[in-house]
């Protein structure tokens, strides 16, 4: 929760108070990355369970999840007071380095085996989703540390910024 408090304090240092409507508007104009809609739809058409596991905020992730019509999603969240203003607290549902716990729970809740799980992520923190028996695809890493971590982990990496390029690696 500390990282969320820190982010909220940085925002409030620039502007306070911040109303939830402002945050909704800020996230309303998001665009999907190239190939996201097509890749997810292809997986859903094949009967694949698709979930978004993000250490981002629920306002953003819920919008993306809705646009893509995924089966499930989880993200951290904001807390607003009774008048709709952002408080200093956040809701921490998962840590960036603890996504593997979420993957394990999703697999158990939905009756899936790790051997049938493929996680896709763009940073070294996402490697935590590579639970035992599963597969992982590095996707368009931007930081050198992520590129190095993916190479050390021996996972395939898609360098194009088009999610469809990950489909052939999913098997």
Go through the PLM ranges and name each one.
Residues 1-44, 49:
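A metal-dependent, Asp-based hydrolase signature
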Residues 25-37, 52-55, 75, 91-97:
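Conserved beta-strand/loop elements of the cytosolic catalytic core of P-type E1-E2 ATPases, chiefly
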Residues 36-68, 72-77:
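Substrate-recognition element of Asp-dependent hydrolases with the DxDx(T/V) motif
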Residues 54-55, 116-159:
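Acidic, Mg2+-coordinating phosphoryl-transfer loop and its flanking beta/alpha structural elements
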Residues 65-96:
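Histidine/lysine/aspartate-rich catalytic loop segments that bind and position anionic ligands
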Residues 75-81, 141-145, 161-165:
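Short, acidic/turn-prone active-site loops that include or flank metal/cofactor-
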Residues 81-88, 145-155, 167-170:
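Short, charged, surface-exposed secondary-structure boundary motifs
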Residues 97-129:
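Conserved Lys-Pro-Asp/Glu-containing loop-to-beta segment of HAD-superfamily phosphomonoesterases
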